[in-house]
Curated annotation (Swiss-Prot):
Source organism of the structure: Huperzia lucidula (Shining clubmoss)
Protein name, UniProt field: Photosystem II CP47 reaction center protein
InterPro entries in UniProt: PS_antenna-like (IPR000932), PS_II_antenna-like_sf (IPR036001), PSII_PsbB (IPR017486)
Role according to the record: One of the components of the core complex of photosystem II (PSII). It binds chlorophyll and helps catalyze the primary light-induced photochemical processes of PSII. PSII is a light-driven water:plastoquinone oxidoreductase, using light energy to abstract electrons from H(2)O, generating O(2) and a proton gradient subsequently used for ATP formation.
Keyword Membrane: yes
One cellular-component annotation, GO: chloroplast thylakoid membrane
Locations listed in the record: Plastid, Chloroplast thylakoid membrane
Length: 508
């Protein structure tokens, strides 16, 4: 056809029948990928330990999205919360995956049908007989249908009126479960961590979409506006669609990275800011002080800390610790966590309680420094032993564990104390199995990090795509040298189509 590879999509510019065919095929590919990816993830997923080896530690990407929408059970007899399941019903993880694959096949067949039967009366202007699309009307139809879907999701699925609800948890990711959510119409609905805002915003946006769709179906655009915005050009649709997609991608990159009610930490892992701000450390400290006020011993107080909460307070679960070129799930890095050793409390020979300075997010190595409650450095692991003043040996540091597997155990051997001081830099201390997956000890990012990176990157690329196609449609006459108001048929390439009587045939 004489088109370079990067311009082959122009063959559907003035061909509504095949334009719908390629969009159907694209939807088939997206749906097929989602279903296939879900089945792959379910095949490699180990649901046996939802506390220390949750889905986000195993690198699952599409399963968390299914879970937040209300899917929690598997035909394999397990549920995401750890219970055994006898009857998962149709809408299990595998059921949803199978539905996507079946839908993909139907879209594939529809794409083939529309590719073959491209010359439909539906796409011909009865006045001129030429292929055409009433783009403003199509815009109204899409707006109306998406509004209905948006409203239905907020009013029925999220609220539990006709659906399971969504995943809701507490700020510390301990009590998460699928439950109905009532809409919140006050100012608190704008808080990104309030689940009720998800219901109310979908209801409000859906109503707006329905009204806007009806408006665009019943009111024609003014001729000046129609021409100014090139509403008759399909590339205008492409440009504005790309704008909607890149804007959405930027928004979800932000809600994922910074956290929100729609991206719960039980499904996607903690955010880096929870480590930076000592979010879980502060909650653990509050619980310990509360227990101590009830006259519990340190050992009893630490034994009451949920293992799940302690595990969040570990730098290996920070999505910013994994490099972009370190492929694989978190478990491939520091291994599969198998147990919490307990909280390490360091003391010098004078009886001062010492706190190990924690490693900041963006450091790979960090000096081991132990300070007292007032921030005065009292011990360290020196770089140059000859000049050391505060070495573990000189200061006589000991370590004792409270809670966890080493509850009540203490060590005074300097080598052992140093080992645990180094590990305490990384938060709470966990024992990991590195043998099973041949884990290399190098931190990986969680699905939260990968989602953010992917969506921010593609949003940037799509932003440039919007500028490019917007410029092409607004200044088409300048780029092509053709008057946009010209009535003459302009042929950019030779169209070769099944059943097209105008297609040139080679003379045999």
């Amino acid at each position: 056809m004489g088109l370079p590879w990067y311009r082959v999509h122009t063959v559907v510019l003035n061909d509504p029948g095949r334009l719908i065919a390629v969009h159907l095929m694209h939807t088939a590919l997206v749906s097929g990928w989602a279903g296939s990816m879900a089945l792959y993830e379910l095949a490699v997923f180990d649901p046996s330990d939802p506390i220390l080896d949750p889905m986000w530690r195993q690198g699952l990407f599409v399963v968390p999205f299914m879970t937040r929408l209300g899917i929690t059970k598997s035909w394999g007899g397990w549920s995401i919360t750890g219970e055994t399941v006898n009857d998962a019903g149709v809408w299990s993880y595998e059921g949803v995956a199978a539905a996507h694959i079946v839908l993909s096949g139907l879209f594939f067949l529809a794409a083939i049908w529309h590719w073959v039967f491209w010359d439909l009366d539906l796409f011909r202007d009865p006045r001129t007989g030429k292929p055409t699309l009433d783009l403003p009307k199509i815009f109204g139809i899409h707006l109306f249908l998406s509004g209905v879907l948006c409203f239905g999701f907020g009013a029925f699925h999220v609220t539990g009126l006709f659906g399971p609800g969504i995943w809701v948890s507490d700020p510390y990711g301990l009590t998460g479960k699928v439950q109905p959510v009532a809409p919140v119409w006050g100012a608190e609905g704008f808080d990104p961590f309030v689940p009720g805002g998800i219901a109310s915003h979908h209801i409000a946006a859906g109503i707006l979409g329905i009204l806007a769709g009806l408006f665009h179906l019943s009111v024609r655009p003014p001729q000046r506006l129609y021409k100014a915005l090139r509403m008759g050009n399909i590339e205008t649709v492409l440009s504005s669609s790309i704008a909607a997609v890149f804007f959405a991608a930027f928004v979800v990159a932000g809600t994922m990275w910074y956290g929100s009610a729609a991206t719960p930490i039980e499904l996607f892992g903690p955010t880096r800011y929870q480590w930076d701000q000592g979010f879980f450390q502060q909650e653990i400290d509050r619980r310990i002080r509360s227990s101590r006020a009830e006259n519990l011993s340190l050992s009893e107080a630490w034994s009451e800390i949920p293992q799940k909460l302690a595990f969040y307070d570990y730098i290996g679960n920070n999505p910013a610790k994994g490099g972009l070129f370190r492929a694989g799930p978190m478990d491939n890095g520091d291994g599969i966590a198998v147990g919490w050793l307990g909280h390490a409390v360091f003391k010098d020979k004078e009886g001062h309680e010492l706190f190990v300075r924690r490693m900041p997010t963006l450091f790979e190595t960090f000096p081991v420094v132990l300070a007292d409650g007032e921030g005065i450095v009292r011990a360290d692991v020196p770089f140059r032993r000859a000049e050391s003043k505060y070495s573990i040996e000189q200061v006589g540091v000991t370590v004792e564990f409270y809670g966890g597997e080493l509850d009540g155990v203490s060590f005074s051997d300097p080598a052992t104390v140093k080992k645990y001081a180094r590990r305490a830099q990384l938060g709470e201390i966990f024992e990991s199995d590195r043998a099973t997956l041949k884990s290399d000890g190098v931190f990986r990012s969680s699905p939260r990090g990968w989602f953010t990176f992917g969506h921010a990157t593609f949003a940037l690329l799509f932003f440039f795509g919007h500028i490019w196609h917007g410029a092409r449609t607004l200044f088409r006459d300048v780029f092509a040298g053709i008057d946009p108001d010209s009535d003459a048929q302009v042929e950019f390439g030779t169209f070769q189509k099944l059943g097209d009587p105008t297609t040139r045939r080679p003379v045999v």
